């Protein structure tokens, strides 16, 4: 990997410039060092992302090459290093000491738009609760709630988890459907195979939010697994369970 790009959260400009200088001194070609969407469709061997999971999500929608993340936010589930580990990264880069953590996207067919984390249909604060119908090959589900979320395994440690959804291992071939503030306590998340095509109908037009971006008002969408994938480079000693123990305290040994 010789041609590299850097995409960074604006607050991390200084860190991005420091990394750029380190890479140039090691003989790498840094094709861009940007915090804007000007990186879109730039062809490099690897895009380095400095920021939180939000910055990483944004980068995943702009480029098609492998990504490696440096944590500059709170949790950083998508990050492989911290912004204090440039030396460790350079050593791994020289020795190609990485494994590929491949992640799949969802596709919202109505918009031809892709999703790495979650698709959310949710009412405005001043709206009443809505009736939601979800249909797929194995049947139908109905919810009276503020909204509904479909999450990928990648998104299962994000907003979906805050709604009470389960954590999915990254290579799980499934996604999670979770109601938002349902009226009935029995309404819980359901995990379905990722080969299902999911049709969602809401009795009112509500906000469609994909990976944190609001696409306007919709009352009906179709969501399915996309052929689009992205490769996240991890150090060979990366351990997902260690990550959730450290960041969430989940499954951590107490005694």
From Swiss-Prot:
Q: Which UniProt keywords apply?
A: ATP-binding, Cytoplasm, Kinase, NAD, NADP, Nucleotide-binding, Transferase
Query: Could you confirm whether the keyword Nucleotide-binding appears in this record?
Result: yes
Q: Do the record's keywords include Manganese?
A: no
Q: Which GO terms describe its biological process?
A: NAD metabolic process; NADP biosynthetic process
Where are the disulfide bridges? none
User: Quick one: where is this thing mainly located?
Assistant: cytoplasm
UniProt catalytic activity: NAD(+) + ATP = ADP + NADP(+) + H(+)
**Subcellular localization, as worded in the UniProt entry:** Cytoplasm
- Mind listing the GO molecular function terms for this protein? ATP binding; metal ion binding; NAD binding; NAD+ kinase activity
Entry binding sites for NAD(+)? 53-54, 58, 117-118, 128, 144, 146, 157-162, 181
A GO cellular component annotation here is: cytoplasm
Q: Which cofactor does it need?
A: a divalent metal cation
Enzyme Commission (EC) number: 2.7.1.23
What family is it from? Belongs to the NAD kinase family.
Query: What's this protein's function?
Result: Involved in the regulation of the intracellular balance of NAD and NADP, and is a key enzyme in the biosynthesis of NADP. Catalyzes specifically the phosphorylation on 2'-hydroxyl of the adenosine moiety of NAD to yield NADP.
Q: What is this protein called?
A: NAD kinase
Q: Which organism is it from?
A: Thermosipho africanus (strain TCF52B)
């Amino acid at each position: 990997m010789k041609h590299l790009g850097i995409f960074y959260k604006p607050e991390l400009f200084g860190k991005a410039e420091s990394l750029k200088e380190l890479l140039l001194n090691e003989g790498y070609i840094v094709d861009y060092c940007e915090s804007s969407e000007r990186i879109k469709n730039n062809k490099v061997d690897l895009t380095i992302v400095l920021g939180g999971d939000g910055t990483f999500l944004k980068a995943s929608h702009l480029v098609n090459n492998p990504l490696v993340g440096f944590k500059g936010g709170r949790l950083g589930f998508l990050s492989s290093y911290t912004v204090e580990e440039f030396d460790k990264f350079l050593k791994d880069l020289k020795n190609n000491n990485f494994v590929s953590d491949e992640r799949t996207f969802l596709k919202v067919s109505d918009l031809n738009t892709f999703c790495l984390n979650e698709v959310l249909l949710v009412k405005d604060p001043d709206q009443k609760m809505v009736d939601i119908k979800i249909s797929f090959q194995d049947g139908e589900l109905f919810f009276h709630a503020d909204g509904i979320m479909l999450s990928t395994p990648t998104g299962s440690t994000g907003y979906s988890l805050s709604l009470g959804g389960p954590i999915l291992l990254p290579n799980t071939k499934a996604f999670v459907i979770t109601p938002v503030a349902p009226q009935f306590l029995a309404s819980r998340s359901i995990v379905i195979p990722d080969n299902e095509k999911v049709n969602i109908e809401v009795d009112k037009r509500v906000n469609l939010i994909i990976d944190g971006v609001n696409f306007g008002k919709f009352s009906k969408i179709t969501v399915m697994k996309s052929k689009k994938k992205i490769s996240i480079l991890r150090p060979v000693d990366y351990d997902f369970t260690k990550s959730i123990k450290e960041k969430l305290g989940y499954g951590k040994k107490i005694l």
